[in-house]
């Protein structure tokens, strides 16, 4: 189950995030398994994760993004595992459906925080800075959407994945229930990319082997806009604030 449900480790008050990171580095992380870790490396890994949020950055990329001489890949992996167990990171695993063609599906996870406010704190981002950097804002918004989708899917007994294949056809989120039903989701902060996102979802849906996997229950473009509606092509467009289990 997602660490977002029933865990006091997860932060819901944005103002708490910087203090939480400080407390984590000071003591909490050592309580996971009793091992003492390099606080400088830990802080740099958190910042690197924040800079690579909502991407499929490899551990090598995470390490290369650190300042100074980075630790070994094995050390980075161990630190990431500790931060995952501490409910700081919560990567999104890849979905592997049966496709009509033999398209290679990527298996790398998408990097996410359990609560995106921790990423905002690690970046030192402010509302004004985010308004001036829509690329970062969009990636953080995507992670916010993943957090909420995970919360609702936990309540429904389902899981959230992501999909990307070698042609770069993707779904930012794939919602999967225990009975096999699924839905495809793209996340877009504004309204301009909605048409392209809807076309992308339709294309992906057509590639899935419906005889084995079934048809998608719905296709959804999740946005930061204000209005929910169903397009003529059947794709649902809905603001994040409208979600409910």
What do the PLM-derived regions correspond to, one by one?
Residues 164, 221-223:
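Short beta-strand/turn micro-motifs composed of small residues
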Residues 181-193:
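Active-site ExK catalytic segment of metal-dependent nucleases
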Residues 224-245:
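Domain-level recognition of nuclease-like catalytic cores that cleave nucleotide substrates
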């Amino acid at each position: 189950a997602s660490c977002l449900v029933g865990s006091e480790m997860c932060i819901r008050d944005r103002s708490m995030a910087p203090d939480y990171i400080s407390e984590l580095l000071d003591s909490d992380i050592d309580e996971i398994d009793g091992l003492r870790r390099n606080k400088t490396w830990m802080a740099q890994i958190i910042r690197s994760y924040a800079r690579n949020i909502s991407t499929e950055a490899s551990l090598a990329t995470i390490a290369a993004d650190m300042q100074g001489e980075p630790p070994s890949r094995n050390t980075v992996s161990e630190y990431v595992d500790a931060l995952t167990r501490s409910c700081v990171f919560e990567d999104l695993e890849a979905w592997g459906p049966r496709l009509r063609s033999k398209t290679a599906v990527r298996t790398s996870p998408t990097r996410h925080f359990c609560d995106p406010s921790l990423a905002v704190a690690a970046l030192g981002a402010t509302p004004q800075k985010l308004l001036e950097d829509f690329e970062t804002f969009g990636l953080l918004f995507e992670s916010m959407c993943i957090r909420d989708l995970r919360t609702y899917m936990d309540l429904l007994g389902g899981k959230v994945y992501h999909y990307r294949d070698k042609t770069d056809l993707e779904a930012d989120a794939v919602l999967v229930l225990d009975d096999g039903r699924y839905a495809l989701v793209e996340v877009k902060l504004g309204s301009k990319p909605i048409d392209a996102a809807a076309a992308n979802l339709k294309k992906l849906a057509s590639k899935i082997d419906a005889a084995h996997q079934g048809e998608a229950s719905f296709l959804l473009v999740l946005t930061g806009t204000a209005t929910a509606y169903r397009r003529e092509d059947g794709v649902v467009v809905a603001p994040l604030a409208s979600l409910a289990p």
